[in-house]
């Protein structure tokens, strides 16, 4: 994957995550505020102040996620972002992390 392909893919992934969180917020399933700064998306859970931070790491061609449960790295393989340690998929993992931190069962 070229640098441009990675940057385009990372941008569309972050946009999709932000849109999904905004949709869940609009549907009153979870109370979050998303803040975007360049390649970093910060999701704050209003009820408890906890955060999930997602950013792209162009030199590594990875997406990184920081949450209360820890830090996670994802590489794009076979059309999805896969955790480099446990093989979990990014959106499934974010659903579980956001459910735990937000106190509601949600699916991105």
Language-model features, listed with the residues they occupy:
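N-terminal intrinsically disordered, cationic/polar leader segments
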Residues: 1-53, 57-108
